[in-house]
């Protein structure tokens, strides 16, 4: 049940995406603003080719744009120097909006596969 809730929540993020600036000119703060409530910007070293919807039975097709990301670290948008930097300067890997997890270490690397929405799908 939890997995379906997460997928529905993240699918709403994809559906709400608008046409904004290109990913190469996006600041960290703009990226954070594109994430839904309860989500934050993460920089992830790995992403699976299999969409997250397939891991829980396709999610009735609502999981378009979702993927499983791993080896993620949270990008701190509360630091003004970081928030105003370009996203591609702060994250050379895969930038994504991921649901904040209570098990996430504040400054650590999250090794679990998280259902996330690539920021490039949101702008």
Swiss-Prot record:
Matching InterPro entries: Hydrophobin (IPR001338)
UniProt record similarity statement: Belongs to the fungal hydrophobin family.
One Pfam family this sequence matches: Hydrophobin
GO cellular component: extracellular region; fungal-type cell wall
Chain's gene name: HYD2
Protein name as it appears in the record: Class I hydrophobin 2
Gene Ontology terms, MF aspect: structural constituent of cell wall
Traits of the deletion mutant: Does not affect pathogenicity in a corn seedling infection assay nor the production of microconidia, but affects microconidial chain formation.
Keyword Secreted: yes
Compartments reported by the entry: Secreted; Secreted, Cell wall
Signal peptide coordinates: 1-16
Superkingdom as given in the UniProt entry: Eukaryota
Native organism taxonomy: Eukaryota, Fungi, Dikarya, Ascomycota, Pezizomycotina
Induction: Expression is positively regulated by the cAMP-protein kinase A (PKA) pathway and more specifically by the adenylate cyclase FAC1. In contrast, deletion of PKA catalytitic subunit CPK1 has no obvious effect on the expression of HYD2.
Organism: Gibberella moniliformis
Job description of the protein: Aerial growth, conidiation, and dispersal of filamentous fungi in the environment rely upon a capability of their secreting small amphipathic proteins called hydrophobins (HPBs) with low sequence identity. Class I can self-assemble into an outermost layer of rodlet bundles on aerial cell surfaces, conferring cellular hydrophobicity that supports fungal growth, development and dispersal; whereas Class II form highly ordered films at water-air interfaces through intermolecular interactions but contribute nothing to the rodlet structure.
UniProt keywords, alphabetically: Cell wall, Disulfide bond, Secreted, Signal, Sporulation
Disulfide bridges in this chain: 35-97, 43-91, 44-72, 98-116
């Amino acid at each position: 049940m939890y997995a379906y809730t997460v997928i529905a929540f993240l699918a709403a993020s994809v559906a709400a995406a608008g046409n904004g600036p290109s990913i190469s000119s996006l600041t960290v703060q703009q990226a954070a603003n594109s994430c839904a409530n309860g989500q934050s910007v993460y920089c992830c070293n790995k992403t699976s080719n299999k969409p997250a919807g397939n891991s829980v039975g396709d999610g009735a097709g609502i999981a378009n744009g979702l993927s499983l990301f791993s080896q993620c670290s949270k990008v701190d948008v509360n630091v003004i120097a970081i928030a105003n930097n370009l996203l591609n300067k702060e994250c050379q890997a895969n930038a994504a909006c991921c649901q904040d997890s209570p098990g996430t270490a504040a400054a650590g690397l999250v090794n679990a596969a998280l259902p996330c929405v690539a920021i490039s799908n949101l702008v």
